């Protein structure tokens, strides 16, 4: 069994638990996911099965889309509702929409983020959350991410609790920490804040309406209809230029051979090569040797 399943990860489950359950349902160990979702986050989690595990990295390259909520008025150790409260500041008056929009605009485009201590980023071979659980703080590597859209959906002031809730939609590059983004938004507004809710709407080119739940997958296996829900591995490569090669070229590709631009009749920097209706390899142009060489082999048969 080979293909990609756009899974709907339910809130409360880890991404690893989803993979573990699918291994039991599909009776195969060759399964991987593209892009971890925190346990408290629901939404799109592309799962690669069998030979499709070779395209996990390419699925992860695509942009993401999220919808969520920022709760302004206090901060926690984890930047979400799971952590211990470490700071509090009442929102005495409703924050105007104009200020929220201005702050969101300042966080749109290319920005620098520092990963939260409660994250899986490794420093000196150890995950940050392991340091955090031990009560240690370490210097974290900065990363550059792109926020292509940061949209205000609604804003609601809670007069009784002196807090404010902001619902948002965000489209971003891989590696973006939404928790950090919304906490930074709260800081720009002059308050501590936490991410109170998050759903991933898009990942790996898949949207929420394409997803299957674990129960859906189990039912499809029972009725022997899963194949119709599996996406081919070339779905992960759909944004690359495509080229169908002939027998002579395929024999070279099978052996990892290099190909000349004249053989492929292309000037693309990277290109997906198919033969006999199946994606076989990803090649890239080597300017030094002026030849196309293999980046990744997907099938040699």
Swiss-Prot record:
Keywords: Isomerase, tRNA processing
Function: Responsible for synthesis of pseudouridine from uracil-55 in the psi GC loop of transfer RNAs.
NCBIfam families listed in its UniProt record: TruB
Example GO molecular function: tRNA pseudouridine(55) synthase activity
EC number, as in UniProt: 5.4.99.25
Active site annotation, chain numbering: 38 (nucleophile)
Family classification: Belongs to the pseudouridine synthase TruB family. Type 1 subfamily.
Gene: truB
InterPro entries, sorted: PsdUridine_synth_cat_dom_sf, PsdUridine_synth_N, tRNA_psdUridine_synth_TruB, TruB_C
Taxonomic source organism: Limosilactobacillus reuteri (strain DSM 20016) (Lactobacillus reuteri)
Catalytic activity, as annotated: uridine(55) in tRNA = pseudouridine(55) in tRNA
Protein name according to UniProt: tRNA pseudouridine synthase B
């Amino acid at each position: 069994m080979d293909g990609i399943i756009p899974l709907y990860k339910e809130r409360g489950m880890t991404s690893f638990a989803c993979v573990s359950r699918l291994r039991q349902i599909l009776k195969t160990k060759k399964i991987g996911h593209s892009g971890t979702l925190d346990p408290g986050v629901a939404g799109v989690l592309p799962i690669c099965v069998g030979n499709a595990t070779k395209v996990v990295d390419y699925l992860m390259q695509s942009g993401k889309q999220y919808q969520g909520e920022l709760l302004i008025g206090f901060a926690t150790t984890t930047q979400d509702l799971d952590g211990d409260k470490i700071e509090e500041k009442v929102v005495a008056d409703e924050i105007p929409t104009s200020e929220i929009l201005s702050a969101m605009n300042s966080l749109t485009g290319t920005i620098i983020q520092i990963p939260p201590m409660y994250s899986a980023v490794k420093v000196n071979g150890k995950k940050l959350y392991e340091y955090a659980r031990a009560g240690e703080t370490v210097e974290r590597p900065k990363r550059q991410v792109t926020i292509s859209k940061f949209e205000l959906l609604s804003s609601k002031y809670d007069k009784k609790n002196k807090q404010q809730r902001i619902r948002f939609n965000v489209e971003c590059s891989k590696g973006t920490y939404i928790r950090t983004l919304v906490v930074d938004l709260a800081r720009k507004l002059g308050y501590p804040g936490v991410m109170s809710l998050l759903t991933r709407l898009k990942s790996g080119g898949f949207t929420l309406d394409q997803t299957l739940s674990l129960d859906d997958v189990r039912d499809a296996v029972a009725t022997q209809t899963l194949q119709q829900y599996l996406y081919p591995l070339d779905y992960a490569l759909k944004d690359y230029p495509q080229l169908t090669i002939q027998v002579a070229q395929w024999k070279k590709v099978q052996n990892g051979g290099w190909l000349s631009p004249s053989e492929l009749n292309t000037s693309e920097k990277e290109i997906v090569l198919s033969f006999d209706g199946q994606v076989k390899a990803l090649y890239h142009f080597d300017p030094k040797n002026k030849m196309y060489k293999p980046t990744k082999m997907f099938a040699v048969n």
